[in-house]
Structures are given as C-alpha cells and as structure tokens.
C-alpha cells in the first residue's frame, strides 16, 4: 500500500513513511534520507526538523520547540517548517502517523 499523502497543518503528526529512513551516512559524513532508488541530502536545519518528525509530535510542537531553541519569531519559523514539510510530503517523503489500536 502506498503511503498516504498529507496536507501539512499544525495538528498533523508527520513521520517518514516505511520506505524512507533518515540516516547518518559515514561515507558522505552527512545525514541523508534513503528511499528506494533515491537519496536526499537535507541541510542541518532540515535534519533537526526531520528528527522531530517521529509521529508523536504534532507540527505545532515542532514549531514551538524550534522557536524556543532559536529564540525566533514563531510565525516565521512556522512558515518555513510548514513549507519544508509540505514539500517533502508532496514528494512522498512524509506521511502522517495514524492512531494505533490499544
């Protein structure tokens, strides 16, 4: 089954789909997103955001954490985070965590 495409909002809980992994590549000495026949090399800020995309945190919590860490305007951080996450979702590198049955 193909991963569900999402429309990123502050309430969604993004996570990498099963076919993609965020991994530190020792050869390249940088973080990469590995997917079948594709490799993306995100920058440092994108890596920090992706590490927070664990399916437990919603986008609002990710934005709040980054705004607090960098003492930056939440609205500005929010626009950048939402744009990056939506771009990755549109390319199939992000999906939304689903509720698990108890």
From Swiss-Prot:
A Gene Ontology molecular function term of the record: quinone binding
Top-rank taxon: Bacteria
Pathway stated in the Swiss-Prot or TrEMBL entry: Cofactor biosynthesis; pyrroloquinoline quinone biosynthesis
Annotated GO biological process: pyrroloquinoline quinone biosynthetic process
UniProt keyword terms in alphabetical order: PQQ biosynthesis
Known role: Functions as a PqqA binding protein and presents PqqA to PqqE, in the pyrroloquinoline quinone (PQQ) biosynthetic pathway.
The family this protein is said to belong to: Belongs to the PqqD family.
Quaternary context: Monomer. Interacts with PqqE.
Protein name: PqqA binding protein
Taxonomic source organism: Rhodopseudomonas palustris (strain ATCC BAA-98 / CGA009)
Encoding gene, per UniProt annotation: pqqD
